[in-house]
């Protein structure tokens, strides 16, 4: 649930940043334009980091499953040898 809230917050920040950037362009306010661009870019970075974390977690879960399968195979092999 926290991840979903984080993704929502990132999307909201991206939209707000894009709006500030557009406002800065329309009003020729370079500060507002850069602020918006920075906010939008930071939201993208957070979203990509969240994706990378999800990928790492998924990879770790797959590795754990493979290790468990390996232990089960070894256990079965030693049980048959007795």
From Swiss-Prot:
Instruction: List compositional bias (Basic and acidic residues) regions by residue number.
Output: 1-36
Instruction: Give the residue ranges for region: Disordered.
Output: 1-39
> Mind telling me which InterPro entries this protein's record contains?
CsbD, YjbJ_sf
Pfam families with a match to the protein in the record: CsbD
Domain of life, per the record? Bacteria
Can you tell me which family this protein belongs to? Belongs to the UPF0337 (CsbD) family.
Q: Quote the protein name from its UniProt record.
A: UPF0337 protein EF_1180
Species assigned in the record: Enterococcus faecalis (strain ATCC 700802 / V583)
